[in-house]
Design a protein with these regions (language model features):
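Compact nucleic-acid interaction/catalytic patches
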Residues: 30, 34, 45-83
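Low-complexity, polar-biased intrinsically disordered regions enriched in Pro/Ser/Thr/Gly
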Residues: 15-32, 63-76, 97-109
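Short N-terminal edge-element motif at the start of the domain
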Residues: 1-36, 42
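Alpha-helix initiation/capping motif
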Residues: 6-7, 49, 150
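Short loop/turn segments at secondary-structure transitions that flank enzyme active sites
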Residues: 10, 47-49, 56-58, 89-95
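C-terminal terminal-subdomain/extension
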Residues: 74-170
Length: 170
């Protein structure tokens, strides 16, 4: 498991795909003014499809997230992993984020702390990913399902993207 940047074109494709099939999309934006959002993964695999969860600055505890806390400073929450917004990503559409190549020193330090948290909690993260996936796909809690990506729809979009976009590029 590692930090990755997800291809913007693919992310936008999933947003359009989910909106077309569901009427709304919960696929998070990854483009921000100062830097693009990145993801941690693969947090789980379903039918050979790897899922990645965004690392977010959101700092409120919710059922579908894990707060990222800095070791030795439990009160300082650095962000969260928001599992209701995890997405399936083909290997061709991710690029490993090399922390030591990040130029902004403060941001690089934050990334190192977040990465260490994720690695120290990898098993917990994988369990949470599987639990939220199961809860959403079986509609165990309507409010959670409504506020989550439609994982099965995204899996279909993932397959269609590979078939219609990636195969034609090769």
């Amino acid at each position: 498991m590692d930090f990755y940047r997800i291809n913007e074109e693919y992310n936008q494709y999933l947003q359009r795909y989910e909106k077309e099939k569901r009427g709304v999309t919960k696929v998070p934006n990854i483009r921000y003014t100062d830097r693009n959002k990145f993801a941690f993964g693969a947090v789980m695999q379903v039918n050979g499809i790897n899922y990645y969860v965004s690392v977010s600055s959101f700092d409120k505890k919710q059922e579908a997230n894990i707060l990222i806390r800095v070791p030795g400073d439990e009160k300082e929450i650095k962000g969260s992993l928001r599992f209701n917004y995890m997405i399936p990503v083909p290997e061709a559409c991710i690029e490993r984020l090399v922390i030591k190549e990040v130029e902004d020193g403060k941001y690089r330090l934050l990334l190192n702390k977040e990465y260490q948290f994720c690695m120290d909690n990898a098993e917990r993260i994988q369990k949470k990913a599987n639990k939220i996936y199961e809860m959403v796909t079986t509609n165990r809690k309507q409010k959670l399902t409504d506020n989550s990506c439609a994982f099965r729809i995204l899996e279909q979009g993932y397959r269609e993207y590979i078939e219609n976009v990636l195969r034609t590029k090769c």
